[in-house]
């Protein structure tokens, strides 16, 4: 087998859809026993700030949990395509049918609320974390 250059690998990855990339990442995690999740820093609270409220979260993850009404699947697929530009019909259908799936990560509270409202109105169940 001929060795691929980094440039060839990057080019091949660039041609894949979002859904295909997600599957590739899962396969790599399983094969190499690693996770693609970013490390989480643990911050110890100071003694003087014992009563201080936790900082308000600024980035959210929007997850499609499923369908509230299976008869509205087509509407949810259309909204998923609006949320994820460039997502093909087949990939959007697979994403909806494979729920729960992450729709968007690291979005603002306002954007997360807009996505939830649109998907919920179309017949989907959404979780913001």
UniProtKB/Swiss-Prot annotation:
Q: Which UniProt keywords apply?
A: Ribonucleoprotein, Ribosomal protein
Task: Write out the GO cellular component annotations.
Answer: cytosolic large ribosomal subunit
Q: Does the keyword Ribonucleoprotein apply?
A: yes
The terms under GO molecular function for this entry are: mRNA binding; structural constituent of ribosome
Task: Tell me which Gene3D superfamilies the record gives.
Answer: 3.30.1390.10, Single helix bin
Q: Which SUPFAM superfamilies is this protein grouped with?
A: ClpS-like, Ribosomal protein L7/12, oligomerisation (N-terminal) domain
- The yes or no answer to whether the keyword Membrane is present is no
| Top-level taxon in the UniProt lineage | Bacteria
Q: Which InterPro entries match?
A: Ribosomal_bL12, Ribosomal_bL12_C, Ribosomal_bL12_C/ClpS-like, Ribosomal_bL12_oligo, Ribosomal_bL12_oligo_N_sf
- What Pfam families does its record include? Ribosomal_L12 (PF00542), Ribosomal_L12_N (PF16320)
GO terms in the biological process aspect are: translation
Looking up HAMAP family in the UniProt record yields: Ribosomal_bL12
- What does the UniProt function comment say about this protein? Forms part of the ribosomal stalk which helps the ribosome interact with GTP-bound translation factors. Is thus essential for accurate translation.
User: PANTHER family from the xrefs?
Assistant: 39S RIBOSOMAL PROTEIN L12, LARGE RIBOSOMAL SUBUNIT PROTEIN BL12M
Its family remark reads: Belongs to the bacterial ribosomal protein bL12 family.
Q: How does it assemble?
A: Homodimer. Part of the ribosomal stalk of the 50S ribosomal subunit. Forms a multimeric L10(L12)X complex, where L10 forms an elongated spine to which 2 to 4 L12 dimers bind in a sequential fashion. Binds GTP-bound translation factors.
This protein is called: Large ribosomal subunit protein bL12
Phylogenetic classification of the source organism: Bacteria, Pseudomonadati, Spirochaetota, Spirochaetia, Spirochaetales
């Amino acid at each position: 087998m001929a060795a691929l250059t980094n440039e060839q690998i990057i080019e091949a990855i660039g041609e894949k859809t979002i859904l295909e990339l997600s599957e590739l990442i899962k396969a790599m995690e399983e094969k190499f026993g690693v996770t693609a999740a970013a490390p989480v820093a643990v911050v110890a609270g100071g003694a003087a700030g014992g009563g201080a409220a936790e900082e308000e979260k600024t980035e959210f993850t929007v997850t499609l949990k499923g369908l509230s009404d299976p008869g509205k699947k087509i509407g949810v697929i259309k909204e998923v395509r609006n949320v994820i530009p460039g997502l093909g019909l087949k990939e959007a259908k697979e994403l909806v049918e494979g729920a729960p799936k992450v729709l968007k990560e690291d979005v603002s509270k306002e954007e997360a609320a807009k996505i939830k409202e649109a998907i919920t109105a179309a017949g989907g169940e959404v979780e913001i974390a």
